[in-house]
C-alpha cells in the first residue's frame, strides 16, 4: 500500500499519519529536509521532485514496499501554484500517473473553517492563505488519477479519522 497524507498546514497530517502507521504497521516517511529552504524558493522543491521523488517511486516499485507519506508530490503541485514558483509539470504528471498505476491512495486532510489558524513556522500562512491552499487541494483532487479521500478534521477526533481512513482503504 502506498498512502499519502496531504492538506493545508495545521490540518493534522502528521498526527494522523503517525497513528495510522502504528495501527497498520506500515512505515511512515516525512521529508524533514523540506524546511531547510525558504518555501517560496523553487530550487529545492523542483529538484527534489525531479530527481528525488522519481528515484523514490522507482525504489518503491522495485522493492514493492508499503509506505505512508506525510506530504509528497501533491504538496509541490499545490504550493508551487500558491507561491507562483517554478515547478516541473511534466514530472508531476508522470509521478501521478505512475502512482495511480501502482494503486496509490491520497488522504487530503481539510477543515471547513481555518478561522484563527496560522502556520507555526511561517506567519504569512494565515487563515486567508490556508483557505487558498485548501482550494488548491480541491483542484488537485480533480487533477490526480489516484484514489482520493477528503478527510474533514475540524473535530480533531483521531479515533474517528483513523476508522474512516481504514474503512475507505478497504472499499
Predicted regions and their residues:
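Walker A (P-loop) ATP-phosphate-binding motif of ABC ATPase nucleotide-binding domains
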Residues: 2
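Surface-exposed cleft-lining segments at the edges of enzyme active sites
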Residues: 32-47, 74-87, 122-124
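Conserved P-loop NTPase "ATPase switch" module shared by AAA+ and STAND
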Residues: 65-77
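Conserved phosphate-donor/acceptor-positioning beta-strand/loop module used by diverse small-molecule
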Residues: 69-72, 89-120
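NTP-dependent small-molecule kinase module
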Residues: 124-171
